[in-house]
């Protein structure tokens, strides 16, 4: 069973941390059996499994539904759950109630919040009441409208300095971990060197403390285009499509089901069912 203590021990021993998204029982079960260190129940589920064009429509009920399923499939893995869009801005009591549900009902080990500024104050307050938080900086999908699309962040001197300072502020606020998304690898390396908490990269190069990728991207399952930073380790699109096509063809041509797929009963019972001959 991984805890923040065991994860920090791995980091301090220079062992890379591996995080993978999972959105349901079977994906979580496979991820745990494969040996990932952390599972992220990301609001990316909105696009990957619910068919939305962004993470914005994802609700708290969506996150709870999927996090419960993931925990049932991965009972011994550290699970981080995203706070969905607009659930942690404004009134803190409302934020606290939402966060509490992810821990109590969703059985999260930590929750992830995107952004800096007021978000870091929220992280600090949640940490003070005993709720472990993960910060998410760089490309933050919930703010993609403000960021003018899915672009690499921190490429200018001013943007890089802001990102570095925000990362340091996230650690000071009490964040237990930082996810850096779509950041130049040189900047990500500098940030990882400055922080004492694990820095998990996605599109942030190799010189951070660990990596996170989306389950469906790693398996090329149900996705058409992969981001530049993704390495697919299988092509389940092809495998699954071929398998389903075979099922369709064999059903239509009468090759399925065969005798080995069927059940039998005593013919005399069948006769009795119809009142005999």
Swiss-Prot record:
Keywords: Cytoplasm, Magnesium, Metal-binding, Pantothenate biosynthesis, Transferase. It comes from the Bacteria. This is 3-methyl-2-oxobutanoate hydroxymethyltransferase. Signal peptide: none annotated. Transmembrane segments: none annotated. Gene3D superfamilies: Phosphoenolpyruvate-binding domains (3.20.20.60). 3-methyl-2-oxobutanoate binds at residues 43-44, 82, 112. Binds 1 Mg(2+) ion per subunit. The lineage of its organism: Bacteria, Bacillati, Bacillota, Bacilli, Bacillales. Catalyzes the reversible reaction in which hydroxymethyl group from 5,10-methylenetetrahydrofolate is transferred onto alpha-ketoisovalerate to form ketopantoate. It is found in: Cytoplasm. The keyword tRNA-binding does not apply. Mg(2+) binds at residues 43, 82, 114. Pathway: Cofactor biosynthesis; (R)-pantothenate biosynthesis; (R)-pantoate from 3-methyl-2-oxobutanoate: step 1/2. Its cofactor is Mg(2+). The keyword Cell wall biogenesis/degradation does not apply. Homodecamer; pentamer of dimers. Its main location: cytoplasm. One of its GO terms (molecular function) is magnesium ion binding. SUPFAM superfamilies: Phosphoenolpyruvate/pyruvate domain. GO terms for cellular component: cytoplasm. It catalyses: 3-methyl-2-oxobutanoate + (6R)-5,10-methylene-5,6,7,8-tetrahydrofolate + H2O = 2-dehydropantoate + (6S)-5,6,7,8-tetrahydrofolate. Its EC number is 2.1.2.11.
């Amino acid at each position: 069973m991984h805890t923040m203590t065991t994860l920090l021990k791995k980091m301090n021993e220079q062992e890379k941390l591996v995080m993978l998204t999972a959105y349901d029982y079977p994906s979580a079960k496979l991820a745990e059996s494969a040996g990932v260190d952390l599972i992220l129940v990301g609001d990316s589920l909105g696009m990957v499994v619910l068919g939305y064009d962004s993470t914005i429509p994802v609700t708290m009920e969506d996150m709870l539904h999927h996090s419960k399923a993931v925990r049932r499939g991965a009972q011994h893995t550290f699970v981080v759950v995203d706070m969905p869009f607009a659930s942690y801005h404004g009134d803190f009591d409302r934020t606290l109630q939402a966060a509490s549900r992810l821990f109590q009902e969703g059985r999260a080990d930590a929750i992830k919040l995107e952004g800096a500024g007021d978000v870091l104050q929220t992280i600090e307050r949640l940490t003070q009441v005993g709720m472990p938080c993960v910060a998410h900086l760089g490309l933050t999908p919930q703010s993609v409208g403000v960021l003018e699309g899915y672009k690499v962040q921190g490429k200018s001197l001013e943007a890089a300095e802001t990102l570095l300072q925000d990362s340091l502020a996230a650690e000071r606020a009490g964040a237990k971990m930082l996810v850096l998304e779509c950041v130049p690898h040189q900047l990500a390396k500098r940030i990882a060197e400055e922080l004492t908490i694990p820095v998990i990269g996605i599109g942030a190069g190799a010189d951070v403390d660990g990596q996170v990728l989306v389950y469906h991207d790693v398996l090329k399952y149900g996705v058409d285009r992969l981001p530049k930073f993704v390495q697919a380790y299988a092509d389940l699109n092809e495998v699954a499509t071929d398998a389903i096509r075979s099922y369709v063809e064999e059903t239509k041509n009468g090759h399925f089901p065969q005798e080995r797929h069927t059940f039998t009963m005593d013919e005399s019972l069948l006769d009795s069912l119809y009142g005999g001959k």
